[in-house]
């Protein structure tokens, strides 16, 4: 709807954008796929705080991983004269964001982004983080490592799987590559782990859960199966959350710089408000937080 209208009334949109900049609404739109997911909840809090620190108001919209809701949210934000948008997109319709960024208001993507796009984004080095995590498992003697992935359409998931595959291949373990699952959810982690541990005679050495929520499902399934992470099977997670510190055992995980990501997103957006030609594409380093869930084999 936005793209079609942009093409049909391009001159009107450009005129409105000029009026918007003059009007100075001092409002920023934030679009996230979920606020029940701890990662996005934390990211939203950082972005809102940083926007308010700059004397602006923030409108937070939730797309529920729906492209239809995403387009509706963008339309609503444009109708409310936001000066810029920070979004974690769902789906593959980059033209939607390109049109808004070009004709209506600056857009900065956060966490998720589009490859070969001239739209600014702030994300993590997802491939590097997964590469480091898998190498860590391999260096601890693990050879049969199962990767529980999320939605294959998400760039963050694809990059993490790419890092896992690269580490396995460079170690000569390409025949042991095993990628299962289809969402960054507790349910997915639980279901896939139940399938993995169903045959006790062929347990893998380790599970690499590609999100914090997936790791929660893994832990639940292991507990129900009377298996202990770090003893019967090793576990490492991508994503950090303070609750992992209080689990028994404490989960080894790849931490993203969520605070830095949110602050950078706001900084880049305001740079684009001042200079619409600015494009910044940044991938932040991750780090491994060591717990007790990885055994030495």
Write out the residue ranges for each language-model feature.
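Short acidic capping loops at alpha-helix termini that bridge into adjacent secondary structure
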Residues: 144-145, 174-177, 228-235
